[in-house]
């Protein structure tokens, strides 16, 4: 868990936000997908060795919709790669770290993901992600 993978930014509309990241910042658009389990659409951009993820809620009961209502658009989370998410979650649990997810769930790009409570991380939502087998060495 020593490498930053991506930074998640909550937006009301990917379509409206995309132009800034592509045309103003000059970031390369990678792809867009729907993550049904999270009730969001996401779009990824390459920013050096890190990706930016724009996150748009699909429904009013999406956690991202609730985040946007409470805090508005902006930084949603930072995500770190880990080799074995299940083992990492167990190690954190053994250290009494408060987790949002005790078990991995499905995220974008086929990754397994889990979140650490912001109460543990000075108010920052931290995501841990384990890439699919063929993505472990991506951008290294």
Curated annotation (Swiss-Prot):
Residues crossing the lipid bilayer are none
Please report the stretch or stretches of sequence annotated as the VOC domain: 3-131
GO molecular function annotation: lactoylglutathione lyase activity; metal ion binding; methylmalonyl-CoA epimerase activity
UniProt similarity note: Belongs to the methylmalonyl-CoA epimerase family.
BP terms from Gene Ontology: L-methylmalonyl-CoA metabolic process
Q: Where does a divalent metal cation bind?
A: 6, 53, 77, 127
Gene giving rise to this polypeptide: yqjC
Q: What protein am I looking at?
A: Uncharacterized protein YqjC
InterPro entries in the record, alphabetically? Answer: Glyas_Bleomycin-R_OHBP_Dase, Glyoxalase_1_CS, MeMalonyl-CoA_epimerase, MMCE/EMCE_epimerase, VOC
Q: Which UniProt keywords apply?
A: Lyase, Metal-binding
Q: Which domain of life is it from?
A: Bacteria
């Amino acid at each position: 868990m020593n490498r930053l993978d991506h930074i998640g930014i909550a937006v009301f509309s990917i379509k409206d936000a995309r132009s800034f990241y592509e045309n103003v910042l000059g970031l390369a658009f990678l792809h867009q997908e729907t993550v049904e389990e999270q009730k969001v659409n996401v779009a990824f951009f390459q920013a050096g060795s890190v990706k930016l993820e724009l996150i748009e809620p699909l429904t009013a009961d999406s956690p991202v919709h609730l985040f946007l209502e409470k805090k508005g658009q902006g930084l949603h989370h930072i995500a770190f790669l880990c080799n074995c998410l299940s083992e990492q979650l167990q190690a954190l649990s053994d250290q009494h770290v408060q987790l949002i997810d005790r078990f991995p769930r499905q995220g974008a790009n086929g990754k397994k993901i889990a979140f650490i409570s912001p109460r543990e991380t000075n108010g920052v939502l931290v995501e841990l992600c384990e890439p699919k087998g063929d993505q472990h060495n991506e951008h290294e």
